[in-house]
Amino acid sequence: MSNVGVTDAPLLSMDEDLFSVKPYVTGLSSFINTCETPMTISIQGDWGSGKTSMMNMIKENMLDTVWPIWFNTWQFSQFRMGNGLAFSMIDVLIKGLGGKKNVLSTVAKGVLGFTRKVACVATDAVVGGEAAGMIRDVTTPTEDVDVAQEILRLKENFQKLVDEKLAKEKKNRVVIFVDDLDRLEPAKAVELLEILKLFLDCKNCVFILAVDYEVVTTGIREKYGDNVSAQKGRNFFDKIIQLPFKIPVAHYSVSKYVGDMMSKIGISVEGNDNELFTALIRTSIGFNPRAMKRLFNTYQLLDFVSRGTVMNIPNNI
């Protein structure tokens, strides 16, 4: 018997494109390749709408012309890391550009001064790498940090790394993908964006952030109080994001996907059946990819139950 069920793994390349989003990927890639820099783009959409898949396809489509760096906040979202998340992100950025420990130390001090907090991370297993050591080094109370000076040095060192990396790799620009910001607590997502603001004015850099406007406004209220106006949340978002891109879920071309899934789960599709099934999905759960996968998985389970073909499971489990 062949395997059943559909996994929720994101797509990695346009060869796997299920919903005919190639025009959007191509358009965004062209914009990223030719836009003025620095530039920050947000990929917005509900959970399961395909933000990570879209970013993966953009990355795969641009490997010949840009130097990509990927930071996935989901890997850290389940840990209460304090400022450790920011240091981990900086660690990924600096190492992605070929930076050494002394550069990372300078950056870490700048981040520490900027946030004006003491970072405490319980174990190297969470952060790992040189970032963990940097956290311990720069959070000792024996050294006063000149915030303005450290931030200036941070920007200068980061820009130098960008320039050297592009010259070495013969690429046009560095594209930094920050995924799954909406999986963080909103206030933590805002803190991470505040750290990113330190780097957003670096030439030849494009930042692509998977973050929703609603997450930012909620985070602003959580961090600074409910008295913060909605307009201030909008201003914060607009100051960071120059190009907001909403995942076009309503315009996904899902007819072929629905037909393929119907065949996979044993439903014969004839005549206009596929159009009918597609319309039913659109008017019930919509075209959110994660929701559709759950629908097909649920159908297959119920089909097994109704046919009495569920695997025999010991009663004592």
Language-model segment annotations:
Residues W47-S49, Q75-Q78, D212-T217, V249-V254, ...:
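Conserved nucleotide-binding/hydrolysis micro-motifs of P-loop NTPases
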Residues M57, L85-M89, E191-L193, E222-V228, ...:
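Short secondary-structure boundary/capping segments
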Residues M1-F79, G84-F87, N157, L161, ...:
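Walker A/P-loop-proximal flanking segment of P-loop NTPase domains
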Residues M55-A167, K171:
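P-loop NTPase nucleotide-binding core
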Residues I267-I317:
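C-terminal helical "lid" subdomain and adjoining coupling/linker elements of P-loop NTPases
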